[in-house]
């Protein structure tokens, strides 16, 4: 009877939990986009999107634990750190605007050199939850995000509007341009996917080939899909790369060389100039890019058309089962820049420097530009030296700048942040110029290999149209700044030389100070004289007497 009562109580508890627990609806989609830039370079983009929503409108979906597709580790981090929106960018390489033209997806899913993290969270003026978030992400992504602190954290006001507005939210932004992107960062991404790398388009990714590309980037975006509510959220993971097909063929070991038929029949032609790679110059295949064909499609994905191939002005759609037979046509990239940006740094000795950014608007419409600069605390920006030149003519900055947010540095506590909003006329070349001062560091503040220089984070250019719609987000190249650095080898040489002299002299001096000198006795001194010696002594003694 007692046993039956316990079973009834257990069944009642399960029924009560099932009635009170919130229902979670989850979705998962994945797709692969391929576009050929030339006979040598192709762009690939792996997109994964996971959605989760709960029927409870008063609670956050991050507080739930019964997920099937949405990664529980991300949900726990978002819930514990009170984050409503999270964005992570990791990039290595330089996007070649001259040959590859416009950045992919208008630059919305690719960052600058190194790591970039920005988040919207509950009112957190003391950065308590922000630092907790970066430390947890550091362990989750196997990256050195724990080096983010108040000295490299900024609060932009214009560059990064949130997906939806939340009251009393605080936005933080940080970048680590010196952080490398490696296989240790890519492997945790696969663990966030429902099918990992066992099925679907993720089975095409090979870490060694991915990091051998000329440019690669990945992004993580967690954001709400409804205004003022975290009951429905989405997480997007995008992995991008520009693949060098010729180098990929050499790595695979199957590239053969044959003489072109146009001019190599001439016997006087140098044979080295007649070598041509054996890969096709008319189209690429999936095997050329990844050295493998995909496995079976991920059964958890709701889409059947998983591969999209750019073919001129149209997009061809294929299922993953047809990937082995897909031919990617080689096409020339069109020159359709919204805005072009170039940034340079001049070093005027070891103490002063100047920075110039050139922005060109090739379109026939004016563009609104938000220019976002950030510097470490040891680079002092002098705002009174800010000048703007329009088509070679220097203009009044007060009349030209529409909005300006400036965060001055605090010595060894916070860096400098500057956001400038202005409108650039059509077909106009604009130059933003200002001076900086390099602050000497203490001896223990120099990083390893200090003579290499220090990476300055890239500037971020946000472009808006007349209706205040964001068109694209551009990153400039990271700059290398040299600051006064002592000769660390001189103390090392002095220490080695001094230690050698001390070692050579210490042994002799220590021997003289500790040894006691005793005169050596003759080995015949204590021996008894023989009978013959005693007889001789007596004879000589009598003669002398």
From Swiss-Prot:
Record text on subunit structure and interactions: Forms a complex with PIG-S homolog, PIG-U homolog and GPI8.
Chain ranges on the Cytoplasmic side, renumbered to this chain: 515-545
Job of this protein: Component of the GPI transamidase complex. Involved in transfer of GPI to proteins.
Glycosylation sites per record: 168, 227, 336, 391, 467
Gene assigned in the entry: gpi16
KW Nucleotide-binding (keyword) present: no
PTM annotation: The disulfide bond between PIGK/GPI8 and PIGT is important for normal enzyme activity.
Family that this chain belongs to: Belongs to the PIGT family.
PANTHER family: GPI TRANSAMIDASE COMPONENT PIG-T (PTHR12959:SF11), GPI TRANSAMIDASE COMPONENT PIG-T-RELATED (PTHR12959)
Subcellular location: Endoplasmic reticulum membrane
Residue ranges annotated as Lumenal topological domain: 23-493
Protein name (database record): GPI transamidase component PIG-T homolog
Signal peptide: 1-22
Keywords, in A-Z order: Disulfide bond, Endoplasmic reticulum, Glycoprotein, GPI-anchor biosynthesis, Membrane, Signal, Transmembrane, Transmembrane helix
Membrane topology: Single-pass type I membrane protein
Principal location listed in the UniProt entry: endoplasmic reticulum
Keyword hit for Manganese: no
Entry's transmembrane regions: 494-514
Listed pathway(s): Glycolipid biosynthesis; glycosylphosphatidylinositol-anchor biosynthesis
UniProt-listed GO biological process terms: attachment of GPI anchor to protein; GPI anchor biosynthetic process
GO CC terms in record: endoplasmic reticulum; GPI-anchor transamidase complex
Pfam families noted in UniProt: Gpi16 (PF04113)
